[in-house]
From Swiss-Prot:
Name of protein: Glycophorin-A
Upper taxonomic lineage: Eukaryota, Metazoa, Chordata, Craniata, Vertebrata
Signal peptide stretch: 1-19
Residues modified to Phosphoserine: S137, S147
Gene Ontology CC terms, in alphabetical order: ankyrin-1 complex; plasma membrane
Subcellular location: Cell membrane
UniProt cross-references to InterPro entries, sorted A to Z: Glycophorin (IPR001195), Glycophorin_CS (IPR018938), GYPA_B (IPR049535)
Gene designation per UniProt: GYPA
Cytoplasmic-side positions: 114-149
Length: 149
């Protein structure tokens, strides 16, 4: 049962990491979600309020301003390589650092779950051995109190 819990925790960590990395891309590509009836054109009349509804309705979509930046292209159609702030070894160290952090977090969660599951020595009572309660002699001795009566 605990193996399933650990599996679900690891799976949820992977899903949350992949979801956080794809939300930024989704924000830049969702320009077509605004309906045409809701987009207002810029006019010089500052008192024109009929392009914006007073209360939003369920079928209308709020405006989203998205700026998409494309890398510059050369005249022959090939893209120009972007210049990064970090060198290749620094980028490699950053990637390995993030990977080590994620793996370390997963192992820390696993270790803490194992510590919670494992019983402490004070909670575990040793099983009594059968020889400790019985005297070592094979001869039975009667209790003198019961025999005198």
């Amino acid at each position: 049962m605990y193996g399933k819990i650990i599996f679900v925790l690891l799976l949820s960590a992977i899903v949350s990491i992949s979801a956080s990395s794809t939300t930024e891309v989704a924000m830049h590509t969702s320009t077509s979600s605004v309906t045409k009836s809701y987009i207002s054109s810029e006019t010089s009349d500052k008192h024109k309020w009929d392009t914006y509804p007073a209360t939003p309705r369920a079928h209308e979509v709020s405006e989203i301003y998205v700026t998409t930046v494309y890398p510059p292209e050369e005249e022959n159609g090939e893209g120009v390589q972007l210049v990064h702030r970090f060198s290749e070894p620094e980028i490699t160290l950053i990637i390995f650092g993030v990977m080590a952090g994620v793996i370390g977090t997963i192992l820390l969660i696993y270790y803490s779950i194992r510590r919670l599951i494992k019983k402490s020595p004070s909670d575990v009572k040793p099983l009594p051995s059968p020889d400790t309660d019985v005297p070592l002699s094979s001869v039975e001795i009667e209790n003198p109190e019961t025999s005198d009566q």
